Curated annotation (Swiss-Prot):
InterPro entries for the chain: CLU-central, CLU_dom, CLU_N, CLU_prot, GSKIP_dom, GSKIP_dom_sf, TPR-like_helical_dom_sf
Pfam family name, one: CLU
Residue list for modification Phosphoserine: S272
Name assigned to this protein: Protein clueless
Keyword Translocase (UniProt): no
Compositionally biased region (Low complexity): 8-24, 990-1013
Keyword set, alphabetical order: Cytoplasm, Phosphoprotein
Similarity field: Belongs to the CLU family.
Organism, as annotated: Drosophila erecta (Fruit fly)
Principal subcellular localisation of the protein: cytoplasm
Physiological role: mRNA-binding protein involved in proper cytoplasmic distribution of mitochondria.
Amino acid sequence: MALETEAKNSNATATSDATATKASGKAKETNNTAGGKKNLNPIPNSNHQNSNQNLVNGNGTAADGPAAKKKGKKNRNKSPPEPTTEAVLSNGHAEKSTLVDAVEDNADADANANVEKPEDGGAPDAEADGEDIDLDALQDVGITVNISSPGADLLCVQLSSMELVQEIHQLLMDREETCHRTCFSLQLDNATLDNFAELKAISNLEQGSTIKVVEEPYTMREARIHVRHVRDLLKNLDPADAYNGIDCTSLTYLNTITQGDLLDKKKTRPDSVDCTPPEYVTPGVSEPPLLPLHPNVKNAKGPQALKVLTTSAWNPPPGPRKLHGDLMYLYVVTMEEKRFHISACSKGFYINQSTDDTFNPKPDNPSHLSHSLIDLLSHISPSFRRAFQTIQKRRTMRHAFERVATPYQVYQWASPTLEHTVDAIRAEDAFSSKLGYEEHIPGQTRDWNEELQTTRELPRKTLPERLLRERAIFKVHGDFVTAATRGAMAVIDGNVLAINPGEDPKMQMFIWNNIFFSLGFDVRDHYKELGGDAAAFVAPRYDLHGVRVYNAVDVEGLYTLGTVVIDYRGYRVTAQSIIPGILEREQEQSVVYGSIDFGKTVLSHPKYLELLRQAGKHLKILPHAVLNERDEPVELCSSVECKGIIGNDGRHYILDLLRTFPPDVNFLKLQDVQLSKELVDMGFPIEHRHKLCCLRQELLEAFIEDRHVSFIRIAAVHLQQLNAKKQSEKAEGNPVPALEGAEAVSKVNGADKTDVKEEKNEENEKAQSTAGDTKTAEAMVNAIREAQSNVATSNEVQAAEVVKRACAAVGSLKEKEFDFRFNPDVFSPGIRHVDGEEGTCSSLAKQKVLVQEAAEFLVLKQIPAFVKEHMTHSSPPIDGQSLTESLHSHGINVRYLGKVIKILNQMPRMDYLHRIAVLELIVRATKHIYYTYMQNTEPLHLSAAISHFLNCLLTNGPVNPAVSSEEAHKKRGNGGKHNKHKSSKGGKGQQQQQATGNQNGSSSGSSNGSSVSDWTLMTPRSLWQQIRKEAKVYWDWELDCDSIETAVSKYGILRISLLRAFCLKVGIQVLLREYNFESKHKPTFGDDDIVNVFPVVKHISPRATDAYNFYTTGQAKIQQGMFKEGYELISGALNLLNNVFGALHQENGSCLRMLARLSYLLGDAQDALAIQQRAVIMSERVNGMDHPSTILEYTHLSLYSFANGHVGMSLKLLYRARYLMVLICGEDHPEVALIDSNISLILHALGEYELSLRFIEHALKLNLKYFGDKAMPVALSYHLMARTQSCMGDFRSALNNEKETYSFYKSQLGENHEKTKDSAECLRLLTQQAVLLQRKMNDIYSSGKLTSDLPPIHITPPSMGSVLDMLNTINGILFVKISRKDIVKVRSEIEKHFKADSPENEVNDAISSIVAAANNNGEAEDAVPKDVEEQKEAGTQLTNGEKAAATEATSS
C-alpha cells in the first residue's frame, strides 16, 4: 500500500488561539473540510515506495519535481535526491538537509536575511552556526502507523514524529472512506491520545503501531459541526461559493479544458487530433464573447443528494427532551420526496415521529441509530446513497489544489445565474456576528491586536523559529483580513451599530468583532487644509503603505496596527485592530509622540526616537527638529502626523503613517519652490485635489542608487587625477600619499553601502547598464581602499577634498560623507522647522532641494527608463493591473499616467502599451465618478443604478433607467445605515462632483427624494464629459473622446475589456451572458444583469524572508549556468513557502513555474509538465482565471504538453491563452504574436496548413509592427510562413519569405552562422521545388495533358522533433550543441581568466567560446540550455523568476 501523509496546516500552535481554532475545525482552514487546507502528500522514503504516487504540492523535498512523476521515469539529467536524512521542520514538512547546507554554503548571498533587522543580534555567520545545531536537532525519519476505523479497511500512513495527533484527525476527515466522521478520538493501547500532543511525545508509539478510531458521544457543539460538515461534503462540487465569494473558494478550469488530468493522458497521434480552433480564437475577432470565460458552467454542479437539509423549527429541544439527551432536530426532504424529522442525541442520529404540525420526539419504528448522519441518510434514501458516492468519487478525482482554500478571497467579475437553495446553515452564518466556529473558542471574540502583536514577538533567531513566526503572522493576518472585510460590508449594509450613534452619520465609527471601522470622510475638518474629503479618502491608502514598509523593516519593539482598507458600494472603510486602552481615554492623553493637530502641538519620546531612528535608517527618513507651540525644538524621526501611543499592554504603537515618505512637489503648488525648466515645460506643478501626494519607496531607492553610482564615478575620477598628479611629482615610485581619499570613500561605503546593496537587489535590472559603465571606476576605488590599509599617509586634506567635491556634485546632505535621507515634513503646511547651518544635513534648504531633485528624477529619468525597458517587449504588461505594477516597480505613481501616455503616444511601436494605459486611465477616472454616484443611490435602487451606469459607460443606445415596478411599490423613507451615509455625503460627494463636473444635477446634501432620482439623470454624454474632465483635472491629460464609440475607434479599446477592467476595479459582478453593446432598441444592461457587488480589499502581504533568500540565491546560480544547484535552491524556496503560506500562494506559483522551466531545460519534459500543471491551477485559483499570470502559465504548459506528445491538449491550452489575451487587451499585442506563432507551428505539424497560415500571417504583422523588420521574431515568422506555404505548394511566396529570413541572418549573424547556412539550404530546396513545379505547369500548358514521366514534388511534413525545436526557439529556449572537446577548451579558457584575475570578462568570453563551438557544428554529445534573451530580465522578484536562465555553460 502506498504510504501517505498530509501536509501540515499553515497554522501551528503559534497564535494564542490556534489550539482552539484547530479543535473547532475552522471552516476556512478546512475549505468546508471536503478538500481541506491539508492535502495528502506522500513523503519519499528510503525505498521509494511512493514513486508512482501523485505528489500534491511538492513541498516535501528538494526533488519536488522528480518526486512528482507518475510513471516512475528515471531522472537522467539531474542527480537524484538523497533519499536518506530528512530534516523535518517544526510543522512536519520533510526537508532535505542538503537545502539547509545550501543556505549555509551561500551565506553571503543570504546574509541580507537579517540586514533589515540588525537587532536580531549576531552576524549571519553566527546565525548559520546556530542554525546548524537546531537543524540537527530537527532530524527525523518519520513513523509508519496503521489506523483502524469502524467499517473501513486498515489504513497505513507515514507521518512525521513532529506532527500533532490533530493532523491524523484532519487526514481522516479528508479521506473518502472516513470523511463523514467528525466526532471521534484516537486511541493507542486503549489510551486516548491528546489532540495537541506531538507524535514523538507518545511513549508507546512505534513503527507499525495501530491507532484505533473510536466514536465519541456528541455534544451540542459537535453535533452542529457534524451537520455543517455533512452540508459541506454534499455541496463540495457546487461552484456557488466561489461565485458568491465566500469561504476562500475560487474557480479553476484547467481540468475542464484538458478534460481530465494531463498526466494521466496517453500520447496522441497527430492524425487523431481535433485541432479546429473555435471561431472566437481565430485572428480577426473584433469583440470576443463572454461565455467561454467560464466553460462547462452547466455541468459544474454535482448530482443532488437531498432536496432539503436544514435545522428543524422544533429547535431547541424542550427541557424534558434535553434530559433524554436530545441535542437538536433536523428536517430532511429526500429526492424521493419523503420528509423526515431527525433527532441528534449524544449517541448519534435517528428518525423521530415528529411532523410539520406535531411534535413527537420518540424514535420512529423501526428505529435506526447511526453515529454518522451520512450513514442514516444512506439507510433511508437510495438516491442519497448513489449521489453521495458519485460526489465523493468526483471530489477525490479533483486535483488537490482545486480543493484547498486560497489565502485571500478571489472574486469573479462574471457569474452565471445561480440557483438559490434552502440552507439553514448559510442563513445562520449570514446573521451571526462571528466567523465560522470562532464563537466556540475561549474568550468568545478574538483579540485581533493581541494576536497580531504576539505573533510578531515570536523568536526569530533560527530557521525553524522564523518559519514558525512567519507562518503564525501569515495565518493571523489572513484571518484578520477576512474578518475585516466581512465587518466592513456589515457596516455599509447597515448591520452594525455605531459607537457614536448620535453624531452625523459620516462621522460615525464602529466596532465589530474587536475591529475598529471608520469611513473615508473628513471627520471634524482634520484634512481641511490638505484637501478635505479628497485627502480623507486617500489617507487610509497612504497609511497602509506606511504600515507595509514599517512591517517590512520589522524593528523589534515597534508595533503597527493591523490595517485593511476596503472599498465597498462606493464607500471607503478603514479597518484597524484596537490598541489596548485607547477607547478608555482621550486621544490627547494617549499620544506621547508626534502631533494630533498637524504640527501645532508636537511631542517627542526617547524610546520612540530610538525605535524610529532604527527604522529610519532603512526607510531613508532624516531625523529633524520642529518647533512646538512654546517655540521649543522637538526632535522627530518620522513625519509630524505619525503618532506614538503606548498601549495598556506596554507596547509602543505607531499609527497615522500617511506621510512616511517625502511629498511629491510636482503635484503641489508651493510658494518657495521653483521647478526646473524641463518640468515647467511639461506642465508641472499640477495642483492635485489633495496635498498628501508623496513619492514611492521604490523611487527613493532608485534615486539613491543613481546618486551613489555618480558619487563613485566622480570620486574615482578625482582620485585618478590626484594619483596622476602625485606620480608625476614623485617619479621615484613612492606610495601615493592621496590614499586617504579612498579611506573616506571606504567610510562612506561602510556607512551607507549596506543599505544601498539591498536597493541594488531591488533595482537589479535598472542599474545594470549604469553599473556596467562604472565597473572600472569602482575597481579602482576598491584597489585604492585595499592599498590604504597597508600604507600610512599624511595627505588627508587632499583626500577629504576629493570626497567633499564628489558629495557636493551629487547633492549629499553631508559635506564629507555620502548621505541621502529625506525629511517627510519639509513642505508640510503649518510646521515650523528648526533650520540648521548651511551645508549640514539639518539645513532646511538642502533638504528641500533633495526632495525636489527626487521628484525631478522621477520625471526625467524613471519615466523614460520605464518606456525604454518596455521597448524590448520582453515582459509586456497585458492589463491595467500589470501596467500599474510595472510603474510602481520603477517608483512611478499612477498620477503620472497622463504624462506616460503622452510619451507613448509618440511611439508607434508602443501602441499596445498606449492603449492599455488609456484604458486604465479611463477606468480610474470612471471609478472616481462611480463612487460619488453610488453614495447618492438608495439601497432600493442599487441594481437599477449600476446597470444604468454601465449602459451610460459602454453603450450609445437607449439608457432610460426604468425603476422596476417591484421597486416602485417599495415607497420607503430614510431606512438603513447606508442611507444615512448617503444623505450626509456632503464631503467627498460634493467635493468630487465639483472636481469632476458632475452633470447629473445631484446635490450631496439634498433630500432623500431628490437623491433617489439623482442617478436617473445621468446620460452617456454627461458621463463621458465627466470622464474627460476628470482625466484633465487628475492626470493633466486630454481624453479626446466624448463617447464609447469614439473611444473604441480612436484608441482601439474593446468594450468587453473595459467592462472587465471596470468591474474588477470597483467590485461589480455581472451576469455571464453575451452582451449586445450595439443594441439600438433596448438597454444593453438590465437590473437582472447585476448579480452582486463585492468589496475591493487592500492589505499588506507578509513575506517569507528565508524562502525569498533561497529563491534569489537559486536565481544567481541559474544565471551562472548551475541549473541543478539552482533547481535545489528553488525547490528549497518552495518548501519554505509551503511552510509559511500553505499550499496555495502567488509566490508558490512563481516557484513552480521556475521549477517547471528548469526541469524542461534539464531535459525532463514529463517532470516539467507535472509541475507546470500545478502552477496553472494555482494561478487560476489565487490570481484569477483571467489574470495575466494565468495566461503566461497556460502558454508554458502548452509547450511542455507538446514536448510530452499531448499535441491536441497543447493546442487547446494555447487557444485558452489566446482567448484570455484577446478578452483582456485585444489582438494587437506582442504576446498575441508569440501565442499565434506557437499555434501556427503546431497546426503546421498537424497538416492544417491553411489555418496555420492565418495565425502566422497575424503573428508576422504584429512582429513587424512591434519589433521592426530587423528583428529575430520577424525573421522566424518569415521562416515559419515559408515552411507553411511550401507545404501548400505555394513555392513562389515561400521563396520570397525565406529570402527575408536569409537576408536578416546574413546581415545580423554573418554568412558562416549555422542559421544563415540553414536558411540558404532552405532557399536552395525551395528554388528547386519551384523550378520543378514551373516545368510541370509549363508542360501542362503546352501539351494540354499531364505527362507521367515528370518527377513528383515531394512535400515532407515536418517531424515532431523539428517542430519542438522550433517551438523552443520561438519561446526563447536555445539548446546549444557542444562537443566534449569544446567544453574542455571553455574550461581552460575560464581557468586562465581566473588566474589573470579579470572576472569581468569571464562570462563574456565563456559565452563567446560556446557560441563559437556552436557555430563549428560540434558533436552533439552535450546540450547546454542557453537563454540569452531572457537573462536580462532576471530580477530578484519572485514574479519575474522564470525569466532567469543561464548564459554560462561551465557547469556542464
